[in-house]
C-alpha cells in the first residue's frame, strides 16, 4: 500500500496490507466512489512515516495511487519516499488489474517496478535494479505470473452478496499476489469485530482479519525476515468500507516485530461520490 522503505512494513505496503480476492463473488454492484485517505506508520509506538492513498472506483474501471515518506528518526538515518499506482477494469463488481507501477527511494537508492497484466496474467514486467543473484533464491517461473493480481489492487476487496459489508465474510478470502520481485499468497480469516474513529472521516465498525503469509517464488527461504513472516500468527488487517461500493480496504495493519509492532493506521478516511478519474503513474508497458 503506502511505500515506506522498511523490511516488514514495505512487505505489507506491497503485500498486505498489502490483499487480492479469490472469494466467490456474486452479481455486479453499482460502484461510484472516491476514497481520500491518509495514514501514519509506527514502529514500537514511534512515528516513522506518513502516507496518502486515493482510490477512484467506478462501475467499469478504477484507479488507485499512493505516496509515502519516512519521518522522525527513520528520516534522519535512512530517509525514504515512494509512490505506487494501479489501474484496471471492474468486472461483475470485481477489480481486475491491468497495470501497476511503484518507485521507492531510500538511502540514495531507487527501486522501480512496472507490471502489465492481462486477464490475471503478467504479460510484461520490469524491475530496477534486478534482484541479486543467489543460488538459494526460488526462481520466478511463467506459471508464477498467472492467476495473480498486483499488491495495490489486492487491497481493494469486494464482498459478495447484498448483506452487511462489516461481517465475518469480509475476511474469508485468499490472495495470489505478484509484486515484480516475489510471488506470494495471503490467506485471511475472521478474528473479531472492532470500532474505529478516524481524525477525519469514517467512524464505525471494522472487521479484523488474521493474515498468513506464504512465499512461493522470488524469495530466499533461509533469509531471516522470510522465516519470521511465515511463522507469524499475529498479523492483523482491519477492514473498513468504501461507502457507495461493496469494497472494503485496509484501515489498519499490524505486524509484530522484535522491536515492537509495525502499524499502519488511517488518520483520515473520507469516501465521497466519484468525480473525475484519479490520475496514476501506472501505465501499459
Segments predicted by a language model, with ranges:
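Internal, conserved structured core segments that host functional sites
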Residues: 108-152
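N-terminal signal peptide c-region/cleavage motif recognized by signal peptidases
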Residues: 26-28
Amino acid at each position: 500500500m503506502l511505500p515506506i522503505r522498511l523490511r516488514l512494513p514495505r512487505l505489507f505496503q506491497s503485500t498486505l496490507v498489502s490483499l487480492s480476492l479469490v472469494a466467490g463473488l456474486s452479481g455486479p454492484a453499482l460502484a461510484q466512489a472516491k476514497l481520500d485517505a491518509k495514514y501514519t506508520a509506527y514502529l514500537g509506538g514511534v512515528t516513522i512515516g506518513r502516507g496518502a492513498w486515493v482510490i477512484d472506483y467506478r462501475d467499469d474501471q478504477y484507479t488507485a495511487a499512493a505516496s509515502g515518506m519516512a519521518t522522525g528518526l527513520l528520516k534522519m538515518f535512512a530517509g525514504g519516499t515512494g509512490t505506487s499506482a494501479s489501474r484496471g477494469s471492474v468486472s461483475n463488481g470485481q477489480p481486475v488489474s491491468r497495470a501497476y507501477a511503484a518507485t521507492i527511494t531510500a538511502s540514495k537508492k531507487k527501486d522501480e517496478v512496472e507490471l502489465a497484466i492481462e486477464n490475471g496474467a503478467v504479460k510484461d514486467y520490469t524491475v530496477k535494479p534486478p534482484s541479486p543473484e543467489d543460488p538459494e533464491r526460488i526462481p520466478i517461473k511463467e506459471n508464477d505470473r498467472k492467476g495473480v493480481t498486483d499488491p495495490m489492487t489486492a487491497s481493494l476487496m469486494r464482498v459478495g452478496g447484498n448483506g452487511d459489508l462489516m461481517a465475518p465474510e469480509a475476511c474469508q478470502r485468499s490472495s495470489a499476489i505478484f509484486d515484480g520481485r516475489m510471488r506470494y499468497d495471503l490467506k485471511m480469516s475472521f478474528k473479531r469485530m472492532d470500532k474505529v474513529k478516524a481524525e477525519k472521516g469514517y467512524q464505525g465498525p471494522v472487521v479484523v482479519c488474521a493474515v498468513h503469509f506464504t512465499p512461493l517464488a522470488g524469495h530466499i527461504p533461509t533469509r531471516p525476515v522470510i522465516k519470521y513472516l511465515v511463522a507469524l500468527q499475529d498479523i492483523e488487517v482491519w477492514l473498513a468500507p468504501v461507502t457507495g461500493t461493496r469494497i472494503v480496504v485496509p484501515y489498519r495493519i499490524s505486524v509484530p516485530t522484535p522491536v515492537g509492532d509495525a502499524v499502519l493506521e488511517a488518520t483520515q478516511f473520507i469516501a465521497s461520490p466519484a468525480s473525475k478519474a484519479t490520475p496514476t503513474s501506472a501505465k501499459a508497458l
